[in-house]
Amino acid sequence: MSIYTSNGNERVLSQESFLVSETDEKGIIIFANDDFCQAAGYSVDELIGKSHNIVRHPDMPKAAFKDLWETIKRGETWNGFVKNAVKNSSEYYWVYATVFPVLRNGKRSYISCRKKPVADEIASSIDLYKTLV
Amino acid sequence: MFGISSKDTQLLENIINEIFDITTGKRNLFRYSKSEFSTNSLKKIKQIIDTRIQDSIKQNQTDMYAVAESQRIILRVKNGWYSELIEPIPASAELNSFKITLNDMIKVNQSRFDDMATLLETYAKNDYTSCIELHQTDEAGGILERLIKGMHAMQNTINTMLCNSLQNGIELQNDAGNLKQAVEALSTASNQQAASLEETAGAMEEMTSNVQQNAQKANDMASMAAQTDASAKEGAQLAQRTATAMTEIQVATDSINNAVAIIENIAFQTNILSLNAAVEAATAGDAGKGFAVVAQEVRNLANRSADAAKEIKAMAAQAAAKSNEGMNIATELTRGFEVIAGKIEQTTMLVQDVSNASREQMQGIGQINTAVTQLDQMTQENAKIAAEADTIANATIEKATAMVEDAASKNFIGKEQIKGKLQHICNTNV
Ligand SMILES: Cc1cc2nc3c(=O)[nH]c(=O)nc-3n(C[C@H](O)[C@H](O)[C@H](O)COP(=O)(O)O)c2cc1C
C-alpha cells in the first residue's frame, strides 16, 4: 500500500506515514525505514552510505540545515518542515521532521522521524523559506 | 458565554481544536503560543494550555524516538542480529508495554537460536549425542516444533549413518583383508603355474627335437630302404642273368657232349681203322713196317683222343653239374630277393607310418606349444591382475581403515555397542 498520493509533482504523505532515517556524525545515512525509501523513491541499498543531502530539494534554504546541524550538535532535538526531492524526478514531498541526537555505546548519531505536515503548515513554511537564503 | 468576549470564545474554540489535532497527530505545531485572551480568567488557563501542549509534544517526540529505535532494532533482528534490545523508554504506557514484550521476544528467540547454534557447533565438532528439546510452551505445529523435530530427525539420521559407516567400515576392512589373502594366494598360484609352464615349455622343446630326430631317422630309413630296394632289384636281375648264363652253359655243355661223342666215335673208328691198318701192315711185312709204326701212332693218337674226349666229357659233366648248382643258387637268390623286396615294402610302409605319426606328433606339439604360450600369457595376465587386485585391496583396506577411524573419531549414539560387538567378532582395533 502506498504511503502517499500524488498531487501534480507533490507526493502528499498519508496520515499513517512515519519516515525514519539515521545518519552518522557526518550526516551519512546508516539506516532508513520502508516509508522513507518509498517516499524518496530509493531502495535502502541506494541510501545506506550516502550523504543525507541525497534527498535535498533546491527550494530548501541553507539556513534551515545550518540551524538543524547547530541544534543537534548542541545535543538538542531539532524540528522543522522540510521539502525533499524524489529520486531522479521533479517530484517532491513535504515532511515535518524531528531530529534526535543519539549517543549509543559512545558513538554519536542522529535519528530523524518525519510525519505528514498539514497544508497550512506547508504554506507558512513556503512563506518563511522565501525569506531565507 | 460566561461573560467571555466572542473573540476569546473563537480563540478558545481554535485552541481546543488545535490541542486535539496535535495530540491525535493530525498537526505538528501549536500555532497559538503567542495568542492572548482578553478575558483575565482565561489568561491563566492559557499558561496551563501552553505548558501542557509542550509536554504533550515532548511525549510525542519521546514515543516517536522509541518507535524509530524499535524499527532500527527490529531490522537488525530481521537481519539475524539478536544482541541489541530497544533502549528508549516511550512515554506512552501501551508503547512501553509493547516495547518490553518486543524485547522479551527478542531475548527468548535469541536464546532459542543460541541453543540451536550451540548444538550445531557441537555437531560440527563431531559430537552427535545430544539434541535440543521442545519447551512445554512450544505450540504444536509451530515453526519451533518443526525445527526441533527436524533437528531430532537429523540427529537420528546422522547417528544411523555413522553407525552404518562404522559397521560397514569394519566389515569392509575385514572383507578387504580376506580379498588381500585371496589375491596373494592367486599370485602364488600364478607364479607356480608360470614356473611349471616354463618346465613344460622346456619338455616340449626336448620332445620336439626328439620327434624331429625321429622324422629325420624315418627319412633316412626310407631312403635306405629305397636304396636297398634298388640293390635288391639289381641283385634279382643279376641272379636272373646268372640263371640265363647257366642255361647257356648247359646248352654249351650239351654241345660239347655231342662234339665229344663225335670225337669218341671218330676215335673209335680211327682206332679200328688203325688196327686194320696194323693188320694190313703186318701182312705187308717189312714194307709195311713203317706203316705199322704210323698205324700204331694213329692208334695211340686215337686212344689219346678218346681219353681226351673222356676227360672233356667228365669236365663237361662237371660243368653241367656246376651250372645246375648255379641255376639252383640263382633261383634261390631270386626268391631271396623277392622276400627282401617284400620286407623292404613292409619297412617302407612302417617308415611311412612313423613319418606320418611324427608329422601328427609335430602338429600336436605345435598345438600344445600354442596352448602353453596362451597359458603363459594368461598366467602373466593373472599375475598382473593379481598385482592390481592387491593394490586395490590395499587401497580398500586403507580407505576402510580411514572410514572406521573417521567414524570412530566421532561421538554418536550406538558407537560403543558396535565397537564392542564387532571387536568381539572381528577382533578389529577401532
Ligand atoms: C538525521 C538527519 C536527517 C536529515 N534529513 C534531511 C532531509 O530529509 N532532507 C535534507 O535535505 N537534508 C537532511 N539532512 C541534512 C543534510 O545532512 C544536509 O545538511 C542538507 O541536505 C544540506 O546539504 P548540504 O550540507 O550538502 O548543503 C538531515 C541531516 C540529519 C543529521
PLM segments and residue spans:
Chain A
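Sensory/regulatory domains in signal-transduction proteins
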Residues: N9-T131
